[in-house]
Amino acid sequence: MFGKLLTKVFGSRNDRTLKGLQKVVNKINALEADYEKLTDEQLKAKTAEFRERLAAGASLDSIMAEAFATVREASKRVFEMRHFDVQLLGGMVLDSNRIAEMRTGEGKTLTATLPAYLNALTGKGVHVITVNDYLARRDAENNRPLFEFLGLTVGINVAGLSQQAKKDAYNADITYGTNNEFGFDYLRDNMAFSPQERVQRPLHYALIDEVDSILIDEARTPLIISGAAEDSSELYIKINTLIPNLIRQDKEDSEEYVGEGDYSIDEKAKQVHFTERGQEKVENLLIERGMLAEGDSLYSAANISLLHHVNAALRAHTLFERDVDYIVQDGEVIIVDEHTGRTMPGRRWSEGLHQAVEAKEGVRIQNENQTLASITFQNYFRQYEKLAGMTGTADTEAFEFQHIYGLDTVVVPTNRPMVRKDMADLVYLTANEKYQAIIKDIKDCRERGQPVLVGTVSIEQSELLARLMVKEKIPHQVLNAKFHEKEAEIVAQAGRTGAVTIATNMAGRGTDIVLGGNWNMEIEALENPTAEQKAKIKADWQERHDAVVAAGGLHILGTERHESRRIDNQLRGRAGRQGDAGSSRFYLSMEDSLMRIFASDRVSGMMKKLGMEEGEAIEHPWVSRAIENAQRKVEARNFDIRKQLLEFDDVANDQRQVVYAQRNELMDAESIEDTIKNIQDDVISAVIDQYIPPQSVEELWDVPGLEQRLQQEFMLKLPIQEWLDKEDDLHEETLRERIITSWSDAYKAKEEMVGAPVLRQFEKAVMLQTLDGLWKEHLAAMDHLRQGIHLRGYAQKNPKQEYKRESFELFQQLLSTLKHDVISVLSKVQVQAQSDVEEMEARRREEDAKIQRDYQHAAAEALVGGDDGSDEMMAHTPMIRDGDKVGRNDPCPCGSGRKYKQCHGKLS
């Protein structure tokens, strides 16, 4: 109450922010008359003038008003479009590391030109990031004339470009592209073998369109570059035949499980678990098929791989539904994005789930993949010096943007008042009653000439509605993942008189629905249209537009509430753009997923008290509030999952940053001779310590073992026992020095034989290849650790703390093994000439060419520890050498010259 009173008196935080920015808008408006008088050449010269001022020490804020005024004037001349004041406000929000919520149709694409131009003046590059290639190309080509008029270059970064084309795109002042491609390029750059192979510049300013889709919906999806692992397709096929023999355990309204079953499904958590009976049944079936030894347990350490396959098959059959979660097209399983309804060709679920779904559908099973590099969008985008985003729906997720990314959300007012009428939800008892009511509403709208957009949550639902409309002889268009190519055309004409369009989630469609249809697309369809043809098309459109407005504008009809209020708001936001008339309503039933899982008890109780009859709907603010509360619960749960994922990934991210920084230093260095010298002493000393323990008596020394190890691993054939027998004054320290000196002498002899330049190049190649191989193994070990870490909770241990501790131990092993393996390889390999190094490089490039790039969907539970009954024995551990660890005061293995505790040891 008191808070509301304060807001009334002082205004909300959002109002105060906008009030402060309005002063700059007034400055820009004051400059408009002067800028209109400038010639084209004088206006273009402003870019060079701004760059000179920045070079002389001026800040971006000090030139913002003039820069925005320049872009506004250039836009008037190039596009005949003038930025509204609200677009100037949006541009300022985007320049200040914030998120601008701008409603659909308010011109986000034109708004983005303001901060993009301003930040491009620094010469460090601006990345404008969209959700798909079509939008990236469209926005780049649409805005190119404006930026080129002002003397800036524009690049497009999409999949399939050559290395040089990518370099050119990144070297442009402003680069348009998709979030996936920017993330993949970052990973590929950190797998490069020479500075020339890198394409990205340091990450400066990212401006993300549909920011909620990329930073929130995609936050649980890591980008993964992977190579094919061993083929186990036969095992997937065999295990797939087991699952139909299993029975689901029933549950009653009380949520208590009753009856005997083999597995239970937790719909809220999207998890499936074997019951004790199910576990026994699966083990017996496996024994019958000769896949498990008699008396053996599926949960024993030796059968972890088998358990992994069984769990994947069970999840594929019980949690993933055809035409909802995926479609089968041309013999391939293609994922459907639950948030946008789009198909995602090339993406695959990880953890063997995709292969299990392929076995279930009887299509060709592709190999499992081994992770070579990965990063989450959360950690990729947090690396940018400046980050901003825009969307039509951000306010519901404002807390998450602030908490995870440190980005405040500012709601930018619309240019014209919003007059859309949002009606209360109608709730029916059954889905059949709901669909009948929807058909009736559509018929009513068509009678008065009002266009209708029907939003569905799945392809299956859109096809069911389409069949009902065919039966009722209602002409309609279907827009779902299966009809991707026609998308822009269908959306463009969805606002025509009486048009009916069925669409799976409209998020990120990128094309506005114009009342009366899109007349620009009609003109573009003609070859060299005359002025008369253009005028006629415009006049016809105006007539249709007026008729649609008179009929009530676009009517949005939702067939089910989504888990997220934001995606419901995106659907609603398709109507009422730029002050147009419009309306929206959601039709629900007690059989809908959200209602059944989260809101059923309370709403069912209301319906029973009211004595609902068949075909009757309940419409009450209490019901809408109960549904909204259910959505809040789901949103809070999803936020917790994303937050937990980030906490786990932050551990890996610290290590990733260290390894990638190390690689870049290695690549950029002329020579790593000093690094090799620093680590050789550590490695040889560590091996000596294992056979001659420090400060120990001679009786405890294993001299024959040391001689053998030095010869096997470092090609050092030394008569250590002979030295000790002949020289009484030879003690532990002097012996250590002599062995290390012997290695140095042998290495110097190798250098004299092949030449210093060849050996220096070989050292770099060996260090990089060894680091990459160990990093790949380390990622696999981290994956296994993460999958089983949740079980530590049963032992009263904090899984996060355990994960941090064990992952750091794994990282220490990585650094230790890196030192050892590099010195061992350099000792053993005989380099004859430059051609040997070139041959090694050629082999490495051949291997690189075999790597397939996969964008994998890792289910959240796979990332933060699944519930598959696996345990710590699952963790793959690299080769461990006793006593071969890095001491806190030892030189850091990265070769920086600093002590380990002051360098990479800080990770602890």
From Swiss-Prot:
Its EC number is 7.4.2.8. One of its GO terms (biological process) is intracellular protein transmembrane transport. ATP binds at residues 87, 105-109, 512. Its main location: membrane. It is an enzyme of class 7 (translocase). SUPFAM superfamilies: Helical scaffold and wing domains of SecA (SSF81886), P-loop containing nucleoside triphosphate hydrolases (SSF52540), Pre-protein crosslinking domain of SecA (SSF81767). Residues 879-888 have a biased composition (Basic and acidic residues). One of its GO terms (cellular component) is cytosol. It holds the Pfam family SecA_DEAD. Transmembrane segments: none annotated. Monomer and homodimer. Part of the essential Sec protein translocation apparatus which comprises SecA, SecYEG and auxiliary proteins SecDF-YajC and YidC. Belongs to the SecA family. This is Protein translocase subunit SecA.
